[in-house]
Structures are given as C-alpha cells and as structure tokens.
C-alpha cells in the first residue's frame, strides 16, 4: 500500500522463475510490469531445467534481464551467449534488459569504456535496426554508431551500480542515465519506494 504512482517512470520487477505467476497476480492492478531474471536461447530441445523465451511469454512476462554480471561470473556466460539470448527475446516480443559492465579488476586496468563498447556490440550483433528500438539498457554512443541517432535516442540506459535512496536523485539527474537496475535496495520496500519517488521527480 506504500508504493507511489509511477507518473514519470516505468517500474519493472524481475523475479525468479518460480515467483513469476505470483508477481503477475500481485501487480495486475498496478502500473508495474513483471520480468524474468534470465532465459535460455533455444526454443525447444532436451535442456533440462532451462526456461525459453516462449515459456516466459506464455506466463505473461514482458521483460527479461540478459547478461547480468552474476550470470557472467558464476555461470560462464559469454558475449556470444548474451547475443543469442537477445535474439531469442526479441523474436517473441520480450523486452531485453541487457547488462554490460566491467569487473573491479577491469576497471582498475582502465579498460571500462572499451569493454562496455565490445559487450554492447556483441549483444546487438545481427539485430536489425527496427528491433533495436525494443532494447533497453545499452550504451547510447555505441548504438548511435550501429544504428544512427534516431535509434540511439529511443534506447533506455539504466545504471546498475548499486543505486539506492541516497544516490538515486543524483544518478538519475545525469543526462545519459534514464533509470536504474535496482538490486539489493529493491529488497527493502521502503528503499524501493524512495528510489521510485526520486525517479518521479525527474
């Protein structure tokens, strides 16, 4: 009952597979979309335990996170895997929330910008320009190089580096930050509400 109306921002809650039906029921009368935390790129086959894009769509999911740092770190996900998942999501009309970014070691090496550009190019490889409009959380400069200024302006870029109530307003005021991919702060309802309120002020 404490969730404010998201007048100027879109709210998407991405939950584990088993919680998707309950989340859709819980948010059905609110302006909150439900997303998944991952998908598998094959449409069908003997892939025990995997969940395809078609399965997510059948559940009523609108969004899916692809390429999260934890997937890359713990499950060995590569840029090629991310690209396959992007194609699978777009093929069935899901909005992919594509995560790109560097590790602490890579940041200290000074290769952040180069790495992000490479990850973004890899994620979008082979994606037609008309489909790129559906994609969230890419790097505007790289998209502009790939598809032109019109598509670059339509892309939503979200900050995923631990946005919280204390830094949300400052981060969201940055010209190239359109939103946040909220992690730990979203687990505390009051903190999540504070971030939404900050977004509504922008």
What name fits each language-model region?
Residues 1-202:
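Active-site loop-to-helix "anion-binding N-cap" substructures in soluble metabolic enzymes
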């Amino acid at each position: 009952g404490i969730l404010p109306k998201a007048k100027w921002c879109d709210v998407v809650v991405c939950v584990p597979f088993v919680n998707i039906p309950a989340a859709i029921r819980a948010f059905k009368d609110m302006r909150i979309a439900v997303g998944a935390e991952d998908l598998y790129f094959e449409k069908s086959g003997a892939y025990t335990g995997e969940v395809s894009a078609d399965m997510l769509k059948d559940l009523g999911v609108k969004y899916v996170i692809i390429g999260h740092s934890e997937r890359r770190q713990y499950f060995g996900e590569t840029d090629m895997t991310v690209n396959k998942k992007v194609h699978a999501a777009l093929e069935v009309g899901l909005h992919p929330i594509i995560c790109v970014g560097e590790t602490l070691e890579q940041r200290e090496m000074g290769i952040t910008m180069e790495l992000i550009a490479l990850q973004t190019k890899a994620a979008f490889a082979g994606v037609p320009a008309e489909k790129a409009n559906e994609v969230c959380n890419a790097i505007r400069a790289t998209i502009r190089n790939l598809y032109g200024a019109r598509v670059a302006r339509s892309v939503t870029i979200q900050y995923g580096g631990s946005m919280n109530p204390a830094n949300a307003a400052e981060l969201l005021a940055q010209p190239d930050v359109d939103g946040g991919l909220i992690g730990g702060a979203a687990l505390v309802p009051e903190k999540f509400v504070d971030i939404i309120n900050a977004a509504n002020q922008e």
